[in-house]
């Protein structure tokens, strides 16, 4: 019996030495110490021994069992250390490798233009006001002296909702709401999104517009002209020639459209300006008396001027973009240029 116990110990010791992973070592534990293991079978055979042999053999088997368990625990620690070292080696980070730079974001070109416009007018004491994009016909049309038969009120030019509301076609409703709430004199600009049923190279169903308004007893068209000349010199960084052309808008009288000297060819004529040397940039005029009456301002005491221009159009001119739709396609390769 002693020889058998020693043989089992030697077999277990050799098997433990040869084990290369935790799974194999666990199998050795089962083979020698499990319910059907070799040492367990010896313990079951004690019943066949004499009363004198049972204690001695039982003690030897337990000693062998303890010895094998100790060898397994020692080997288990060794294998776990090797496993950890192998994992660390596989996941090792080479700190000498160059880092991966994360590109920083930037403001959209239209947002940058909006900030430039806001900065200029806020320095001159203009308030920057905003209003709802979903409007009523009163604020979008009626209060602005736009009659019911006017083409702008047709379904093919304006986005209407079923309940009579609509998506504003300009930021002029912001001016009406402000004039209702404030007493003159005041000056403001109203930047924001506007919507019209139009889509091509130079038009989109949604675009950005900024409108300016000044109500005062001494408001003149000459003052508006001087302001616009100074603004475009600031915006483009150089003096530009301006041309005022008579025009018609229901909410201003007299009305004018303003062209600036082409920023691409300096007025000599090119494809950008259709070889005219001029670029149309905004509409303006003196506020129509009917608009003042609609908001309970006496047109005999106060006068005003207003202008409106597209911020997307200015962004195209400032950055040399030839297709308006590029501003709305979310192409990061394009937007990262700004």
Swiss-Prot record:
Subcellular location: Cytoplasm
One of the protein's GO biological processes: phenylalanyl-tRNA aminoacylation
Alphabetized GO MF terms: ATP binding; magnesium ion binding; phenylalanine-tRNA ligase activity; tRNA binding
Keyword check for Protein biosynthesis: yes
InterPro entries (UniProt xref): aa-tRNA-synth_II, aa-tRNA-synth_II/BPL/LPL, Phe-tRNA-synth_IIc_asu, Phe-tRNA_ligase_II_N, Phe_tRNA_ligase_alpha1_bac, Phenylalanyl-tRNA_Synthase, tRNA-bd_arm
Keywords: Aminoacyl-tRNA synthetase, ATP-binding, Cytoplasm, Ligase, Magnesium, Metal-binding, Nucleotide-binding, Protein biosynthesis
Binding site for Mg(2+): 253
Name recorded for this polypeptide: Phenylalanine--tRNA ligase alpha subunit
Source organism: Legionella pneumophila (strain Corby)
The gene coding this protein: pheS
